[in-house]
Amino acid sequence: MDAEVGALNVGEMEVEVVRSSRRRKTVQAWEVGGVLRVAIPARMSRAEEQHWVGEMVRRFERRRSSDHIDLRARVAALARRYELPHPLSVEWSDRQRSLWGSCTPALRSIRLSSRLAREPGWVLDYVIVHELAHLAEPAHGPEFWALVNRYPRTERARGWLMAKGLEDGD
């Protein structure tokens, strides 16, 4: 047998755990028809299963909360307000653990840590402005900071992020 499937509820969320003999190390989760499906290695202990199911539910809920923010509209409004270039793509990322945001100027793409969805809006706006400024000035030189400093809460937001352990995104 390749996979064993079990169902449970975690809080309000219905979860389906799929134990796969083909899966060796990784844990993956995705939503199917309102059910969070969590795939784990078949040899994983019940304690490890509980840990990873809880972790995947937390990640999914964090992603869901970030979906409530209309990111494209917010980025477009900030780009207009502060006269900064518009990106071709902007998305939330669950994989950004050491950065609040990142920008690839050559692709005109911006990624924002989904953790920002839980921070005050003015902090999110600062990180967006910071990343938008990279579309015009990739390096952290004086021209870059002149663009970022158009946002009136730059110093306050930088202080907030420093207190959280990370100063800026890149």
Question: What are the language-model segments listed below?
Answer:
Residues 1-126, 135-170:
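Active-site-proximal or metal-binding-adjacent scaffold patches in catalytic folds
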Residues 131:
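Walker B catalytic acidic pair
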